A protein has these predicted regions:
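Soluble FAD-dependent oxygen oxidases
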Residues: 2, 8-464
């Protein structure tokens, strides 16, 4: 019998809500009952999920002894590093010459990538603070990764993996941890007709490239595009690590045309938490293969190498660079609205990528790159927007005149070609002629040391 007020007397449209409320009340009541007040409490405790694991930290009683670390070092042939943060000099003496020299070096993202104690980002919206590991295994081969994973598991240690150090979530660093630093695992090998292991007869051969987990995208682009005449979808910033980008999905400058970088993944070698090296592809360990294409770097294992499908190059890569300042807040609102509308109407297509930024100083910075069209076509696309700017000189000023370039696609990441083709964009640093990245007609320093080799801002960090 249904009593007044029970769900059965409610209109049909309200019954689902009433049942949901009752379920919520039941769950809240059940959650409030102490575990020990229920029969079979031991069984319930054993069945309860472990929501957190307490790892051993430096200084804890269970922290490995010096002899333990030495045994690990011997196992990996002397590649264990005691991590020291270069920032320590600035904490101790912020006005010292050493600190000033460090901050000059920090302008070069390739220097940051070469230091195990540094990260390219820190404190994304103040959510975390970059902190160096205690030790790092400077892995040179898969066996080094296996040794590090086993050591961390057996000693209940925090374990982090760093390639490029670009993680916005801070997953490539952690205090009191052991780091697997993959920077030295940076080999690149091209294939004319690659078939994943176990996929013979199930998968058509594809042009592909196998890349070590520690390679930066600059190394991949140089091998695949400059030397090989092919394209592999990767990151817009060339200091990003290949493995981390793939495991995060992999959006890049030309993703509107080529898709996410993870979509090109054909196979990966992964060391899982049990210390086993596994090959993951569509034909074996398919669930792991699916998971690493977006699960986040190091979430499901340590990727040691990846094989990615390559594509034909377009005729040109190029870019449009400019900086426009509005002379009032109301003019900036007009500029913002116009830019968004123009982007929607003219740039939201497969040819265009990378960024437009709206700055607090009422300035609009344009650093757009393109593929599949040439300089003349790019100029025609943008002409209506720049005509609109020119019609209102009382409201807008051009801080950096527009620069539109195109480059035969094969040479987009070729420093020697850039030096020959853009001689006005050359500087000399420590006696060597180096290319500059061109942005809105102003040269921006690009440093060698495996440095940015592109005449476009997405190829490097901007330094004005």
């Amino acid at each position: 019998m249904v009593r007044p007020g029970q769900p059965g007397l409610l209109p049909p449209s309200q019954r689902t809500l009433a049942h949901a409320v009752n379920r919520r009340r039941f769950l809240k009541s059940a959650a409030a009952v102490p575990v020990f007040a229920i029969g079979c409490s031991d069984l319930q405790k054993r069945a309860a999920p472990r929501l957190a694991v307490q790892r051993v930290r430096a200084g804890d009683p269970g922290w490995p002894s010096e002899s333990d670390w030495q045994r690990l070092n011997a196992q990996i042939e002397g590649r264990l590093i005691k991590v020291q943060s270069p920032l320590a000099a600035c904490r101790e003496a912020p006005n010292s010459a050493a600190c000033r020299e460090l901050f000059a070096r920090l302008k070069n993202p390739f220097y940051i990538g070469g230091e195990p104690g540094l990260t390219q980002t820190s404190g994304w919206v103040d959510a975390w603070t970059s902190a160096p590991s205690v030790y790092a295994v400077a892995a040179a081969k898969t066996e080094d990764v296996v040794a590090a994973v086993n050591f961390a598991r057996e000693n209940n240690l925090r374990l982090v993996v760093k390639g490029g150090g670009h993680s916005y979530q801070g997953t490539s660093n952690s205090a009191d941890s052991l780091m697997i630093w993959t920077r030295a695992m940076n080999s690149v090998a091209l294939h004319d007709a690659f078939v994943a292991q176990g996929c013979a007869g199930k998968q058509a051969p594809q042009p592909a490239v196998t890349i070590g987990a520690g390679a930066f995208w600059l190394q991949a682009y140089h091998a695949v595009t400059v030397k090989g005449g092919r394209y592999v979808q990767g990151g817009g910033c060339t200091t990003v690590g290949v493995a981390g980008l793939i495991q995060s999905g992999g959006f890049g400058s030309f993703s509107k045309n080529y898709g996410l970088a993870a979509a090109a993944l054909m196979e990966a070698e992964v060391v899982t938490a049990d210390g086993v090296t596994r090959i993951a592809n569509a034909c074996q360990n398919a669930d792991l293969f699916w998971g690493i294409k977006g699960g986040g770097g190091g979430s499901l294992g340590v990727v040691t190498r990846l094989t990615l499908r390559t594509r034909e190059l377009p005729d040109y890569f190029g870019g449009v660079f400019c900086r426009i300042r509005a002379k009032s807040d109301s003019a900036f609102r007009r500029l913002t609205a116009r830019m968004i509308r123009f982007y929607h109407d003219r740039l939201l297509n497969r040819h265009w990528g990378e960024q437009i930024s709206f700055n607090p100083d009422n300035a609009l910075s344009i650093s757009m790159v393109f593929q599949g069209i040439n300089r003349q076509q790019a100029a025609q696309t943008w002409q209506p927007f720049f005509d609109w700017i020119a019609d209102s000189p009382q409201d807008f000023s051009i801080e950096r005149p527009k620069t539109i370039i195109d480059v035969p696609a094969r040479y987009f990441w070729d420093a020697d070609y850039m030096k020959k083709s853009f001689p006005t964009a050359i500087i000399r640093t420590t006696g060597a002629a180096l290319p500059r990245a061109i942005s809105c007609g102003k040269a921006i320093t690009v440093r060698r040391a495996g440095s940015c080799m592109a005449a476009n801002p997405p190829g490097c960090r901007l330094h004005y």
